């Protein structure tokens, strides 16, 4: 099993505070039933969100959704 580290995600989102916000927002989406962009397996929503960010499927744009 590949382990996801914060460093893997910081390559995609350089600001650690933006990374925290994006990962938390995406984890809430996944926990609420949104389909994952990576194979979820038996991982928790937070790990799935970090894997999506590290893979480049999700970025800071997730924070702008729903705004005009």
Swiss-Prot record:
Its EC number is 2.7.7.6. InterPro entries: DNA-dir_RNA_pol_omega, Pol_omega/Rpo6/RPB6, RPB6/omega-like_sf. It is an enzyme of class 2 (transferase). One of its GO terms (molecular function) is DNA-directed RNA polymerase activity. SMART domains: RNA_pol_Rpb6. GO terms for biological process: DNA-templated transcription. PANTHER family: DNA-DIRECTED RNA POLYMERASE SUBUNIT OMEGA. NCBIfam families: rpoZ (TIGR00690). This is DNA-directed RNA polymerase subunit omega. It comes from Chromobacterium violaceum (strain ATCC 12472 / DSM 30191 / JCM 1249 / CCUG 213 / NBRC 12614 / NCIMB 9131 / NCTC 9757 / MK).
């Amino acid at each position: 099993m590949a382990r996801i580290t914060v460093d893997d995600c910081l390559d995609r989102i350089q600001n650690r505070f933006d990374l925290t916000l994006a990962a938390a927002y995406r984890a809430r989406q996944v926990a609420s039933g949104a389909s994952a962009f990576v194979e979820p397996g038996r991982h928790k929503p937070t790990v799935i969100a970090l894997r999506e960010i590290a893979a480049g499927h999700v970025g800071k744009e997730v924070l702008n959704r729903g705004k005009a």
